[in-house]
Amino acid sequence: MKNLKKAALIALSALMTLALAACGKSGNKVVYRTLDEIRDSGTVNIGVFSDKNPFGYVDENGEYQGYDVYFARRLAEDLGVKLNLVSTEAANRIEYLQTGKVDIILANFTVTPQRAEEVDFALPYMNVALGVVSPDSRVIESLDNWNADDQMIVISGTTAETYLTENYPDIKLQKYDTYANAKNAMENGSAAAWANDNTEVIAFALQSPGFTVGIPSLGSQDTIAPAVSKGNETLLSWINEEIRALGKENFFHADYEATLVDTYGLDFEDSLVVEGGQTK
């Protein structure tokens, strides 16, 4: 009888371990579609930004455009399925994967150890760091002597929010849910500066006269990569092979020249683009 009870406890423990492995940090079951299920359905759902020009945005004709969108279209084409683009915000990228609302996230998703506990990242396709933009009238070039009365704009759920909270806890953060709202706040003078991916603040300054990126690189050098639900091994493996194959045709340089060159010019191309998942 004791042996039977012991065996039952071991079996129960194993089942609980498997159940936990299929759950995110919130304890909710992670839902995803395998590669075959996506192909059988005829449609892939990819999460992108809709307000973050030039990476993911909706143009004047109501069409999605941008660096991430260009990549998403190629993924769908090579999968042999239709593409359904799903508008996402920084704070809900992980949630959209875990609940099965999207199959893949391509929304300027910076790879971090914390995020890798909740989603699986594929090979990278872009380099990135944090940057800080501020008005020309008072350019912020360092955070070490921050004025206690000033506030810093960040977007909730971004690496900028995490980095500043951990490394500069005394800086007051003015948080927004969307890129568009953060951009409007900066233009309206709601805060002294705005911290975000350097690619994004550089683009903002180039498109908005009167602003300067005083801190072009803050914190560590990171990468941006596609993300899938934790445990979705078949889809992850396919994306990695796809990125390697695309590298042989310099796909991401073509993507840059089609979507980013008007904003950044050619000077940033080789430093930002990652081909074949291989960082320099």
Q: Each predicted region: which residue ranges?
A:
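Ligand-binding clefts/hinges and TM-proximal coupling segments of bilobed small-molecule sensing domains
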Residues: 25-29, 159-176, 213-215, 243-280
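Hydrophobic/proline-rich hinge and linker segments of small-molecule sensing/allosteric domains
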Residues: 46-50, 121-142, 226-230
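C-terminal motif of bacterial Sec signal peptides marking the signal peptidase cleavage site
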Residues: 18-22
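A ligand-binding cleft/hinge motif common to bilobed small-molecule-binding domains
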Residues: 95, 109-117, 165-166, 187-221
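Periplasmic-binding protein-like
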Residues: 127-134, 202-243, 262-280
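Extracytoplasmic small-molecule ligand-binding "clamshell" domains
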Residues: 27-108
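A structural signal for short loop-to-beta-strand junctions that line the ligand-binding cleft
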Residues: 35, 67-68, 116-125, 212-216, ...
